[in-house]
A protein has these predicted regions:
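Conserved mixed alpha/beta catalytic, RNA-binding, or beta-rich assembly cores of soluble enzyme
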Residues: 27-33, 112-113, 119-201
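Positively charged, low-complexity intrinsically disordered leader regions
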Residues: 1-11
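An acidic, phosphate/nucleotide-engaging active-site surface
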Residues: 63-146
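Short internal beta-strands
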Residues: 48-56
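Histidine-anchored nucleotide/phosphate-binding helix
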Residues: 27-46
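Short, charged/polar "capping" segments at the starts of alpha-helices
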Residues: 57-63, 166-167
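Short, glycine-rich nucleotide/cofactor-binding loops
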Residues: 11-12, 16-33
Length: 201
């Protein structure tokens, strides 16, 4: 799908960053994978990847950019004018502010969006970790951006491993058979919704 959607100088959003308990720091599997994907998009297509993540992840992403051979900027206009470049954008954790930021990012008309291990809320609006605890306050609400871009018809790919990530609602019935804490009443936070990402994917 990316081969058909992405052309030279096209913007591609990569959504990542999952902040974990108890230390309240981001996990790195999604971040590292996203950096390698960003490099692949630049090398294969001449694309302009922008990592969208919680503010907690920005420093790690900026430090990793040189490791994958890319220059990194927080201004997407600069990214689109310079070679071998990528961007990073911190996305809000405040749900009330998320629609406005999502709308602003959407105006840049990305050719595609890829979510890699980014947290998504369940049907009740609660974000969970792997064992069903409420981590809503820790997470960037980039699921709002995902839903906005999907509604706009932007080609999209989601990667996750436990069901609480963006995009996993698409295969919710399958995930509920094999992954604990995902179905209604199974999470440990008391919301009763399970940790499966709501099916708006």
């Amino acid at each position: 799908m990316l081969c058909d959607a992405v052309k030279e100088n096209d913007l591609v959003y990569i959504i990542t960053g999952f902040v974990l308990l108890p230390h309240k720091v981001p996990e790195m599997d999604g971040t590292v994978s996203s950096m390698l994907l960003a490099r692949a998009l630049v090398m294969a297509f001449g694309a302009k990847p922008v990592i969208v993540c919680p503010a907690d992840s920005v420093q790690a992403i900026e430090k990793c950019a040189a490791v994958v051979g890319l220059h990194i900027y927080e201004d997407p206009d600069i990214v689109q004018t310079l070679p071998l470049s990528m961007g990073v954008a911190a996305f809000t954790k405040n749900l009330a502010d998320a629609p406005a930021q999502a709308a602003e990012l959407a105006t840049r008309k990305p050719a595609a969006v890829v979510s890699v291990e980014a947290c998504g809320a369940n049907a009740l609006g609660v974000c969970h970790n792997a064992i069903g605890l409420d981590v809503t306050a820790l997470q960037a609400r980039s699921d709002v951006l995902w839903e906005k871009l999907r509604a706009d018809g932007v080609p999209n790919i989601a990667i996750g491993d436990l069901g609480n990530e963006i995009g996993m609602g698409t295969i919710a019935d399958h995930i509920k058979k094999y992954v604990p804490f995902t179905d209604r009443g199974e999470c440990q936070c008391g919301c009763g919704g399970g940790h499966i990402k709501r099916h708006q994917d």
